[in-house]
Amino acid sequence: MSEKLQKVLARAGHGSRRELEALIRAGRVSVNGKVAVLGERLEDDNAVVRIDGHVVSVKAQEEVICRVLAYYKPEGELCTRHDPEGRRTVFDRLPKIRGSRWISVGRLDANTSGLLLFTTDGELANRLMHPSRQVEREYLVRVFGDVTEEKVRNLVRGVQLEDGMARFEDVMYAGGEGINHTFYVVINEGRNREVRRLWESQGTTVSRLKRVRYGDIFLDKKLPRGGWMELDLKQVNYLRELVELRPEKETVLNMAPDAATRKRERTRSQKIRRAVRRHEERISATPGRSGKAPARRKPGGESSTRNKVANQQQSSRKPRG
């Protein structure tokens, strides 16, 4: 075996390549007692690899089932495993698993809510995040200020940001009142605060941002804020095939569409909602944990506007079919 250390560790389920590269740069990874350096290759299958002083396996997770969670991130949560200030993170409410850990597929900034995927497969996470894959991300965005046809044309054609050209693949008007307007926008990369910066380049302020789709995976309307659901085999294999990974043959979910299964699903959903409420109550009562949990929205109300364009303002570009 002669592969880069971060690739071997990612395949073994210890994180995404990006996370592991950061650990190596920080001097937290060693090989046979020596601190590893970025770009180092693992030549020996029997090498002793440690992360933060703990010996870790470098064997590929071939026999481990790939799992993917869809999580409804609330505003205010951080996309980090641990926060030194004790603020809430997206990992706080995820289910515990043995022998592996959840890896986030990209990030959402603290003020952004919506769909965030997690997987146990580091290679899947890395490939989905890589810019070359051009995976679409769709957001529901509320902006404050006047939005002209010229501004929309600029956003679709592309504008120069500090880190290069950027553009929306699609812009669709979804309604609004006064100087508050709502749009669905699509991008195919995950640069830091890209949606907000694109709007800001046109002198328009984003007042609310929510991710509603990643590839063909949509945020489930029945999922509460702070809740999660595990993707079924078809959805998992859609993501794997999207980035040219072999499909899985089984899942940890029982997908039999019978009455008993539906009852279990309802029970599971109720348990998730109760767990979310308990977590929020516990956080609110814990000293040193800042911020209140976001207020719950009533279900529905968004999707009905999705295919309608308000009469008072028309987007200059029709959504793609």
UniProtKB/Swiss-Prot annotation:
Protein name: Ribosomal large subunit pseudouridine synthase B
UniProt feature, compositional bias: Basic residues: 263-277
Lineage: Bacteria, Pseudomonadati, Pseudomonadota, Gammaproteobacteria, Vibrionales
Natural source organism: Vibrio cholerae serotype O1 (strain ATCC 39315 / El Tor Inaba N16961)
SMART domains, per the entry: S4 (SM00363)
GO molecular function ontology, one term from the record: 23S rRNA pseudouridine(2605) synthase activity
Organism domain of life: Bacteria
Function noted in UniProt: Responsible for synthesis of pseudouridine from uracil-2605 in 23S ribosomal RNA.
Biased composition (Polar residues): 302-321
